[in-house]
Amino acid sequence: VDAVAALGADVVVDYTSQDFVETVKRATDGKGVDVILDVIGGEYLDRNVACIAVRGRIVQVGVMGGGNTAFNLGALMPKRASLTGTVLRARPLEEKIALSQRFSSEIIPLFESGLLRPVIDRRYPFTAIAEAHAFMGANGNIGKIVIDIAG
């Protein structure tokens, strides 16, 4: 939580000990958020619907919490919100190429200028890859784990 706040987040939620729906409602004066980018899915969908604003968008980009779920469609409809699922893998090669080129032309310059910067938790030499893997498996990282390859 402290690390995320230090990166500049206006509102931080520890989902293991706080109800993120209540936190979002309180932080937005009950209006909800405009966009939710969800990599978990599963049981989070109902809570995401509770957090979304009128005309908001939920973009499902992963299903780490499970791909099958039941949710209250009746809660989504009055908000006139949309739920979009997307993955890169299922897209045609031409579309993947176009997206990669757009990323290179629009996003990479933001990293090069310093406007965006990756959050790196730790760096490991290639010879310590097993240690890096164990660290990742412990789920204690905040940000990316980088493996340096001498070359």
Regions found by a protein language model. Name each.
Residues V13, D34-D38, V61-G62, K96, ...:
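Glycine- and other small-residue-rich loops at beta-strand/loop junctions that grip anionic moieties
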Residues V21, K25, V49-A50, G74, ...:
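Solvent-exposed, non-membrane alpha-helical residues enriched in polar/charged side chains
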Residues E43-L116, N141, D148-G151:
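Glycine-rich phosphate-binding loop and adjacent beta-alpha segment
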Residues A9, G32-V33, L76, L116, ...:
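Local beta-strand N-terminus motif with an aromatic residue
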Residues Y124-A132, I145-G151:
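A short, charged, Gly/Pro-tolerant segment at domain boundaries
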Residues V1-R47:
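Adenosine-nucleotide cofactor-binding segment
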